[in-house]
């Protein structure tokens, strides 16, 4: 997707110009306020492809990255194989404006960029075109059986999740490096029908470590559910609740008191804030954070966590 604004929907252009025409007014994307009223107070059930979760909702971290190379189509397929509906992944932007999945801001750790482009250090995602990134192997580092697995575009990943009937927790990775990426992501999601839900949080949630980016997403798409990654001081939680529906800390930073304090505050949609924690990969830890009252657990091995959680 190009950075050029030619051909952008009017709602995106209006929002970027800060004459914000709310996304709620876009026909076919979000319901009207009246249409949504009957569901406004309803908290979505924690479900997987296999049925209802018991306890915290489980999210496959970067796909089921314990079983396949992170942030690839193979990882989404692995998550589906574990019966996990919600998939977390990270999105960045190439030099020519394509949205691609990558956790690090450089390509070196999870691709063969150093071999393919030896003179392009430090191999920043933002310095490569989509075509150049498409030449890279994003799977061989994980295992020979994944050699040749490509870096997916966001479009490719959405298509895979659609095929698998999965849902998306999408992290905007270092969005300050990519001005305007929030509107571009929303445009991509809208083009692929991911915002056509009575309550979009039932299918897609956008999160980031950068509060300004989360706020921007909320301003552009106020019905969309958002999350802030981190552990804000309890006294500041009401400020975050103006634009974030989730506060998502590292598991090491959690206490029962902190979780309860977050959940006592209502977010921008009038529902209690939720707490999703990361990255939890063993049963003992999973039960500890579940006992703290978290709403969700993000894991590389969600099936292991699911099997270990006490009923």
Map each language-model feature to its residues:
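Phosphate-group recognition and catalysis centered on beta-loop-alpha active-site segments
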Residues: 2-17, 21-311
């Amino acid at each position: 997707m190009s950075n050029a604004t030619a051909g952008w929907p009017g709602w995106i252009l209006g929002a970027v110009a800060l004459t914000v025409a709310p996304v709620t007014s876009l026909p076919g994307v979000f319901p009207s306020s009246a249409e949504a009223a009957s569901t406004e107070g309803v908290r979505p059930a924690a479900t997987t492809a296999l049925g209802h979760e018991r306890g915290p909702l489980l999210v496959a971290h970067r796909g089921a990255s314990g079983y396949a190379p992170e942030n690839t189509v193979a990882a989404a397929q692995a998550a589906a194989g574990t019966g996990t509906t919600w998939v977390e992944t990270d999105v960045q932007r190439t030099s020519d404006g394509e949205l691609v999945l990558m956790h690090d801001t450089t390509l070196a750790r999870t691709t063969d960029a150093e071999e393919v482009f030896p003179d392009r250090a430090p191999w920043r995602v933002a310095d490569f075109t989509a075509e150049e990134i498409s030449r890279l192997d994003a799977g061989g580092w994980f295992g020979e059986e994944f050699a040749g697995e490509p870096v997916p575009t966001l479009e490719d990943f959405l298509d895979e999740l659609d095929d698998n009937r999965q849902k998306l927790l999408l992290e905007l990775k270092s969005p300050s490096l990519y001005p305007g990426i929030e509107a571009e992501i929303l445009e991509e999601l809208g083009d692929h029908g991911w915002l056509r839900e009575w309550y979009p949080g039932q299918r897609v949630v956008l999160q980031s470590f950068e509060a300004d980016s989360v706020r921007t997403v909320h301003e552009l798409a106020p019905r969309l559910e958002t999350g802030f990654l981190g552990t804000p001081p309890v006294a500041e939680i009401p400020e975050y609740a103006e634009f974030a529906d989730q506060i998502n800390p590292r598991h090491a930073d959690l206490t029962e008191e902190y979780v309860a304090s977050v959940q006592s505050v209502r977010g921008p949609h009038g529902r209690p804030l939720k707490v999703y924690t990361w990255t939890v990969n063993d049963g003992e830890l999973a039960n500890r954070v579940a006992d703290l009252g978290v709403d969700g657990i993000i894991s590389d091995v969600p099936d292991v966590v699911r099997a270990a959680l006490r009923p």
